Amino acid sequence: MATHLVLYNGAKMPILGLGTWKSPPGQVTEAVKTAIDLGYRHIDCAHVYQNENEVGVALQEKLKEQVVKREELFIVSKLWCTSHDKSLVKGACQKTLNDLKLDYLDLYLIHWPTGFKHGSEYFPLDAAGNVIPSDTDFLDTWEAMEGLVDEGLVKSIGVSNFNHLQIERILNKPGLKYKPAVNQIECHPYLTQEKLIQYCHSKGIVVTAYSPLGSPDRPWAKPEDPSLLEDPRIKAIADKHKKTTAQVLIRFPMQRNLVVIPKSVTPARIAENFQVFDFELSSEDMTTLLSYNRNWRVCALVSCASHKDYPFHAEF
């Protein structure tokens, strides 16, 4: 199993990274330090997670201790929806760099295709509880992203939560300078994303799978929601390989040539999640796991369903 995937521009992206969405600021510094000590080199961040400063403390410490060199790390962050206006993109990126205490990012993504009204709130809502959109077009946002590459602030740029029609709009943009290197999307056995992944791969775009464990700690979980980690069918595959369900759920996207970013702040689990290079799921296991698709999303961003750029009305 390759430990890296190569982006179209030649950059090498570690296939396994540490996710930091929902990692409490008080715990994420130790989590990132533990991960780096265990061999993780890819850390997935975002401004909206409100913990980049604490992630930065960990990165700074490990760089200072010379546990790792900067060029061995692959640090990802994301532009939040309230900064889609072309004039705001560079400042948003610089805020993230400042918080992470870095002078460049390896990958910077447009977090969602939907632009929101600029201001202090991450989700500006109207009286009816719908998100207030900005009058921006993500093609203009993309031009500003390209500028970050030219200025040396970021090595690669990409998107997240974009459907194939939205990616196609970027690829067909007149005067396109850099195509998206990555599309980061929710992906697991209940949301297998076969068509979107096939599309991205056909365009030379690497796909990162987020919420590979089904995000059991999501704040809006309901008791009747399906649970990947408690699915006896997946547990049976894990038992056969003498592995945990989580390890099977992490190995599954890797064998589909996806990058995967499981989140944990628990040292034992951060370690467990990295022990996935010493076994292989059979083609039968893979087919079985793919058959569990039910188009079930953790992150449906329902407050934005009426936004002109809401990504999940399209089939893929």
Curated annotation (Swiss-Prot):
The lineage of its organism: Eukaryota, Metazoa, Chordata, Craniata, Vertebrata. Its EC number is 1.1.1.21, 1.1.1.300, 1.1.1.372, 1.1.1.54. Belongs to the aldo/keto reductase family. It is an enzyme of class 1 (oxidoreductase). It is found in: Cytoplasm. The active site is at Y49 (proton donor). Its main location: cytoplasm. This is Aldo-keto reductase family 1 member B1. It comes from the Eukaryota. The keyword Oxidoreductase applies. Pfam families: Aldo_ket_red (PF00248). The modification N-acetylalanine is found at A2. One of its GO terms (biological process) is retinoid metabolic process. The modification N6-acetyllysine is found at K95, K222, K263. Transmembrane segments: none annotated. Monomer. Catalyzes the NADPH-dependent reduction of a wide variety of carbonyl-containing compounds to their corresponding alcohols with a broad range of catalytic efficiencies. The record marks K78 as: Lowers pKa of active site Tyr.
